[in-house]
Amino acid sequence: MKIGIVCYPTFGGSGVVATELGMALADKGHEVHFITYNQPVKLDFISHNLHFHEVLIEEYPLFQYQPYELALSTKMVDVVEKHQLEVLHVHYAIPHAYAAFMAKQMLKEKGIHIKVVTTLHGTDITLVGSHPTYKTAVEFSINNSDVVTAVSRNLKDTTNRLFTIKKEIDVIYNFIDVDKYEHAHKEECKLIALAKLDERILTHVSNFRPVKRTEDVIRIFNQVQQEIPSKLLMVGDGPERAKTEQLVRELEISDKVIFLGNSNEVAKILCYSDVFLLPSVTESFGLAALEAMAASTAVISTNTGGLPEVNIHGKTGFLSDLGDVNDMAKNAISILKDDETLLQFKQNAKEHTKQFALKNILPFYEAIYKSCILKV
């Protein structure tokens, strides 16, 4: 099949999933074309059947904000025509689903009938898409897609609650390449560079946006380190990083918290970890938690959004109410204080991720592409 993938080219979950999906499809022999404004950060090679098309936005002084949707839809038309694509798979509803609809209409005028698959990832629905400024356009775009998928049952239910959706939403969970985490563990974990041998390692990975509540991460860790010798690795970057670093200084734990910034080596970093902290306001799925579990790391998270579908309470980690820092710290300590308990949680976490392996999820997307291409 010839597939166009439209996504944000960033470290965010939707961009990572879209990029890894495209690379996996190319590995299986499909022809894949990424259409976005920068080369996706996870796209580290181009091949005969894996392509990148940059969306260029011309600056024009009349516009306060440059019209990316127009440039994107025009590029979609160009790539579909030139490479005879059969389906456009757009990740994140805003603005990709709307741009895809415009492209579809323009192509229809040329006698070309492209199919559009829209995958909803979370904040495109819960935080942005439901805003009155965008809601009507997002609802329209979803209803005019040929197929709509969501990354969790919770996100499907939320979408149906917030919008008037006239078509079925298929749930296809996010996935991970479990082999990547196996390789990371086979390489030597240079733990000694980060912590003493008797210290536990806690980790947080995110884009440091307010929804991730990174200050809660610090407060949880502060309680843990008072009970158990430990270090905290903070991976990622974003608007809340400065405030988070300031809180670390105020609590006088700068010697125990390491800020690593953005990284393409998350699998290797997670191989050091014992517990992963994710106290988010909401997670449509919780890809960061799943990645941690694949690296045999127990998860302490909130019980919001799709997280209960990923993190099994009392088995792979624990779930707590939003903002309940004390409960999350207590749960983390209960896992970390005993070697046998920690090992059991780590083994459970690793085992649970097998159902989310790329090889198990990829066929669902292939089936959707085939069915919508065949549908007249």
Can you annotate each of these PLM segments?
Residues C7-F11, M23-Y68:
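N-terminal strand-loop element at the rim of the active site
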Residues N154, F175:
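Carbohydrate-associated surface elements
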Residues Y181-K196, F364:
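A short helix/loop element that forms part of the nucleotide-sugar donor recognition site in Leloir-type
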Residues A195-K212, I218-F221:
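Conserved donor-binding/catalytic core segment of Leloir-type glycosyltransferases
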Residues N262, V281:
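Aromatic "clamp/platform" in nucleotide-sugar-dependent glycosyltransferases that forms part
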Residues A298-S301, N311:
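Short hydrophobic beta-strand element within catalytic cores of glycosyltransferases
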Residues H313-G314, F318-V325, S334-D339:
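Conserved acidic donor-binding segment of nucleotide-sugar-dependent glycosyltransferases
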Residues D327, S334, T341-Q355, A367:
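A short, well-ordered alpha-helix in the C-terminal region of glycosyltransferases
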